[in-house]
């Protein structure tokens, strides 16, 4: 009998701490729920919206805008692009989208559209093209030192009048009184000629 009594006491001594721990764990959520309910009930009397938001998180405030996702088939943009709705914009501001066949395989958990939208590639004038290595070395042209001593010439056309004829005609006017001298001067006077001469002066 004494052996059985010691056996029961040792079993109870070993199991009592575990039973006590289980009872404490069960009591804690109940106390917290009572405190939360009491606290939320007090708030709900004054601010019912906050009470609903705390009870149902699906009605919580959404700080992010809901935008439609337009997947772009571009090797440089592998992530989804959030496009603004086109209906809000004026016709002048709408983007020109190219509809291309879907080349990305559809995942089993997501349904993808049959077509994908993509921005048109910018024109080459907007892209910066790096210079080639050959263009970095500028060649210095060889200059002829003999030709550089003379200034660059531009051809000009001038009309030259024979000045001897003009001088001789003045002599004719002066010698009208003397007929003998006038005949000699008239015989020696050539006709006035004009000629075009091309000069290379600057």
UniProtKB/Swiss-Prot annotation:
<feature type="modified residue" description="Phosphoserine">
    <location>
        <position position="199"/>
    </location>
</feature>
<feature type="modified residue" description="Phosphoserine">
    <location>
        <position position="148"/>
    </location>
</feature>
<keyword id="KW-0732">Signal</keyword>
<dbReference type="GO" id="GO:0050821">
    <property type="term" value="P:protein stabilization"/>
</dbReference>
<dbReference type="Pfam" id="PF00997">
    <property type="entry name" value="Casein_kappa"/>
</dbReference>
<keyword id="KW-0494">Milk protein</keyword>
<feature type="signal peptide">
    <location>
        <begin position="1"/>
        <end position="21"/>
    </location>
</feature>
<keyword id="KW-0597">Phosphoprotein</keyword>
<feature type="glycosylation site" description="O-linked (GalNAc...) serine">
    <location>
        <position position="153"/>
    </location>
</feature>
<comment type="function">
    <text>Kappa-casein stabilizes micelle formation, preventing casein precipitation in milk.</text>
</comment>
<feature type="glycosylation site" description="O-linked (GalNAc...) threonine">
    <location>
        <position position="154"/>
    </location>
</feature>
<feature type="glycosylation site" description="O-linked (GalNAc...) threonine">
    <location>
        <position position="175"/>
    </location>
</feature>
<keyword id="KW-0325">Glycoprotein</keyword>
<dbReference type="GO" id="GO:0007595">
    <property type="term" value="P:lactation"/>
</dbReference>
<dbReference type="GO" id="GO:0005615">
    <property type="term" value="C:extracellular space"/>
</dbReference>
<dbReference type="InterPro" id="IPR000117">
    <property type="entry name" value="Casein_kappa"/>
</dbReference>
<feature type="glycosylation site" description="O-linked (GalNAc...) threonine">
    <location>
        <position position="169"/>
    </location>
</feature>
<feature type="site" description="Cleavage; by chymosin/rennin">
    <location>
        <begin position="126"/>
        <end position="127"/>
    </location>
</feature>
<comment type="similarity">
    <text>Belongs to the kappa-casein family.</text>
</comment>
<feature type="glycosylation site" description="O-linked (GalNAc...) threonine">
    <location>
        <position position="142"/>
    </location>
</feature>
<feature type="glycosylation site" description="O-linked (GalNAc...) threonine">
    <location>
        <position position="198"/>
    </location>
</feature>
<protein>
    <recommendedName>
        <fullName>Kappa-casein</fullName>
    </recommendedName>
</protein>
<feature type="modified residue" description="Phosphoserine; alternate">
    <location>
        <position position="182"/>
    </location>
</feature>
<feature type="glycosylation site" description="O-linked (GalNAc...) serine; alternate">
    <location>
        <position position="182"/>
    </location>
</feature>
<keyword id="KW-0964">Secreted</keyword>
């Amino acid at each position: 009998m004494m052996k059985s009594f010691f056996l029961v006491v040792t079993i109870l001594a070993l199991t009592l701490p575990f039973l006590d721990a289980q009872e404490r764990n069960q009591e804690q959520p109940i106390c917290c729920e009572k405190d939360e309910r009491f606290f939320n009930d007090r708030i709900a009397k004054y601010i019912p919206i906050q009470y609903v938001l705390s009870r149902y998180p699906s009605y919580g405030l959404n700080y992010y805008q809901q935008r439609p996702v337009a997947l772009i088939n571009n090797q440089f943009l592998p992530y989804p692009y959030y496009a603004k709705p086109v209906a809000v914009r004026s016709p002048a501001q709408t983007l020109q989208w190219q509809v291309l066949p879907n080349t990305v395989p559809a995942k089993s958990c997501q349904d993808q559209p049959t077509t994908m939208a993509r921005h048109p590639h910018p024109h080459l004038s907007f892209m910066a093209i790096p210079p080639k290595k050959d263009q970095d070395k500028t060649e210095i042209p060889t200059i002829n030192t003999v030709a550089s001593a003379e200034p660059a010439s531009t051809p000009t056309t001038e009309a030259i009048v024979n000045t001897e004829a003009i001088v001789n005609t003045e002599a004719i006017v002066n010698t009208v009184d003397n007929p003998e001298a006038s005949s000699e001067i008239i015989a020696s006077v050539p006709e006035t000629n004009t000629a075009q001469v091309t000069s290379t002066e600057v």
